[in-house]
């Protein structure tokens, strides 16, 4: 389950196969959208909550209120079913969409005030390697750090346009 600002998503996987996912970017609050979205996802996939082996949730970074609502919902469902629950960095999760990219993955989320939430990753032999911890960093500081990497750099996330417009990278 991922909740950030107005965006929310839920996905259901079996082994590594995506069975279904829901995404919304509405004006409704997270408390109004999350549980109906999860219920509809389970219904469409014909899966009962009791059949789920493990639940994962976004651990941020992101909006404190949105993360708190997502965590409370997932932990509540997991507790009720005695199901293990794991947290996933939102920044790391973004990188799993690009397992074939051979350069530097630079997920960025707008943290406001000229900063982005960021971490750096790269794939090596089928494994995602974390090069930096999740952090809040100014765009000029990130730009300076990225100059040290000779390989292609891919910006991804809701802060990518902001960074692209601000940075002077080759």
Give the residues covered by each predicted segment.
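N-terminal beta-alpha supersecondary unit
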Residues: 3-59
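Surface "functional belts" at beta-alpha junctions
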Residues: 17, 84-170
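Residues at secondary-structure transition points
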Residues: 25-33, 64-68, 72, 89
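Buried hydrophobic packing segments
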Residues: 38, 73-77, 94-98
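Phosphate-handling active-site elements
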Residues: 43-50, 78-88
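DPxDG-like acidic metal-binding loop motif
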Residues: 56-85
């Amino acid at each position: 389950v991922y909740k950030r600002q107005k965006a929310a998503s839920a996905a259901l996987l079996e082994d590594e196969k995506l069975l279904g996912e829901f995404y919304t970017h509405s004006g409704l609050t997270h408390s109004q959208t999350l549980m109906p979205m999860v219920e509809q996802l389970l219904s469409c996939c014909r899966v009962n909550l009791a059949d789920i082996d493990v639940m994962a949730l976004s651990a941020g970074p992101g909006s404190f209120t949105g993360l708190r609502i997502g965590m409370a919902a997932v932990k509540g469902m997991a507790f009720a079913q005695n199901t293990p629950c794991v947290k996933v960095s939102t920044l790391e999760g973004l990188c799993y969409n690009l397992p074939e990219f051979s350069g530097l993955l630079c997920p960025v989320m707008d943290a406001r005030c000229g900063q982005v939430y960021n971490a750096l990753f790269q794939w090596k032999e089928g494994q995602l390697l974390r090069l930096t911890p999740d952090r809040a960093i100014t765009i000029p500081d990130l730009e300076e750090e990225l100059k040290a990497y000779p390989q292609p750099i891919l910006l991804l996330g809701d802060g990518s346009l902001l960074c692209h417009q601000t940075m002077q990278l080759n």
